[in-house]
């Protein structure tokens, strides 16, 4: 079974149930959530996440596994502000606890961190330090380090940087990788013409068994731009053909694929989610040039 879905919202009283209902309405077989707002530390207690009803709904609809994304405010790469580093460590511990409580997520996607001017090597050492403070041999969920675009002072912009982090962490069996198509393209990897070559390179440097999550996004920018601006499937510089190839790649069939493409529409208050039609299009093998108009008309 193709495990494909999108980022969905866990909100209101329904929480996990709302997320599962939204995912099912898109024809998804997996989905990704934040356990609270990605930009702040406000979190509902675990008992208010409506886990039992959410899991029941998932089971009825054939969804076995979901992905959690850690909030953006976590930056364990910060060497200049001890309080930012500490917040990242404490918050990541809490996210592991919350994800474990869900019982249906094995991976927490984490942006490795930004060195905020101290240099990539210093940032990587700080990320290693942070992960060593957080990871325990008993935990049941992995931290999936996301491949980054190289915007600003981001660490994790190359497979070598990801490998360096993994190699420095004591309990690194608890680390995996989230391969983001927009980010790797923007970082300079040629996933359009030679995805198999890029995957082989990843395998040599990191190990393909670590690739446990895929973020499927097109890119608004040319390869190597270091920008990280997502585009709808087939409407960017990666293109439908390459993304369809990645989604159906025989070596990655077991990996959950998550769309984080932008909502569609000119009116900021009335943008429409693209995921139902994008998922259909990635399943059926034919690019639809009129897709954005169809999404707007939903």
Swiss-Prot record:
Keywords noted in UniProt: DNA damage, DNA repair, Endonuclease, Hydrolase, Metal-binding, Nuclease, Zinc
Query: Which class of enzymes does this protein belong to?
Result: hydrolase
Keyword Manganese listed: no
Return one Gene Ontology term, BP aspect: base-excision repair
Entry's EC annotation? 3.1.21.2
Annotated residues that bind Zn(2+) 3 are located at 183, 228, 230
Per its Swiss-Prot or TrEMBL entry, what cofactor is needed? Answer: Zn(2+)
Residues annotated to bind Zn(2+) 1:
69, 111, 146
Query: What is this enzyme's catalytic activity, as reactions?
Result: Endonucleolytic cleavage to 5'-phosphooligonucleotide end-products
Top-rank taxon of the source lineage equals Bacteria
Cofactor details (free text): Binds 3 Zn(2+) ions.
Question: GO molecular function: any one?
Answer: DNA-(apurinic or apyrimidinic site) endonuclease activity
Q: Which InterPro entries match?
A: AP_endonuc_2 (IPR001719), AP_endonuc_F2_Zn_BS (IPR018246), Xyl_isomerase-like_sf (IPR036237), Xyl_isomerase-like_TIM-brl (IPR013022)
Q: Where does Zn(2+) 2 bind?
A: 146, 180, 215, 260
The family annotation for this protein states: Belongs to the AP endonuclease 2 family.
In UniProt terms, what function does this protein have? Answer: Endonuclease IV plays a role in DNA repair. It cleaves phosphodiester bonds at apurinic or apyrimidinic (AP) sites, generating a 3'-hydroxyl group and a 5'-terminal sugar phosphate.
User: This chain belongs to which protein, by name?
Assistant: Probable endonuclease 4
The species is Bacillus cereus (strain ATCC 14579 / DSM 31 / CCUG 7414 / JCM 2152 / NBRC 15305 / NCIMB 9373 / NCTC 2599 / NRRL B-3711)
User: Which lineage do the record's taxonomy fields give for this organism?
Assistant: Bacteria, Bacillati, Bacillota, Bacilli, Bacillales
């Amino acid at each position: 079974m193709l495990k494909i879905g999108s980022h969905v919202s866990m909100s209101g009283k329904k929480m996990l149930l709302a997320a599962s209902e939204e995912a099912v309405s898109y024809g998804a077989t997996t989905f990704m959530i934040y356990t609270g707002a990605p930009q702040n530390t406000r979190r509902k207690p675990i008992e208010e996440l409506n886990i039992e009803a959410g899991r029941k709904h998932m089971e009825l609809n054939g969804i076995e596994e979901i992905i959690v994304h850690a909030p953006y405010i976590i930056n364990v790469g910060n060497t200049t502000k001890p309080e930012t580093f500490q917040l990242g460590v404490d918050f990541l511990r809490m996210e592991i606890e919350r994800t474990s409580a869900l019982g249906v997520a094995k991976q927490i996607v984490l942006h490795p961190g930004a060195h905020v001017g101290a240099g990539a090597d210093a940032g990587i050492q700080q990320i290693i330090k942070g992960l060593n403070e957080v990871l325990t041999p008993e935990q049941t969920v992995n931290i999936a380090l996301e491949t980054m675009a190289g915007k600003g002072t981001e660490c994790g912009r190359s497979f070598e940087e990801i490998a360096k982090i993994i190699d420095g962490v004591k309990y690194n069996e608890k680390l995996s990788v989230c391969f983001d198509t927009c980010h790797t393209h923007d970082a300079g990897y040629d996933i359009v013409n030679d995805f198999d070559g890029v995957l082989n390179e990843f395998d040599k440097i990191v190990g393909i068994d670590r690739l446990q999550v895929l973020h499927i996004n097109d890119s608004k920018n040319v390869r190597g731009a270091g920008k990280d601006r997502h585009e709808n499937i087939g409407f960017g510089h990666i293109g439908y053909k390459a993304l369809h190839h990645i989604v159906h790649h025989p070596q990655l069939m077991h990996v959950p694929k998550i769309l984080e493409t932008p909502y569609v529409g000119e009116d900021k208050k009335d943008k429409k989610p693209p995921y139902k039609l994008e998922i259909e299009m990635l399943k059926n093998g034919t690019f639809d040039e009129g897709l954005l108009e169809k999404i707007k008309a939903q």
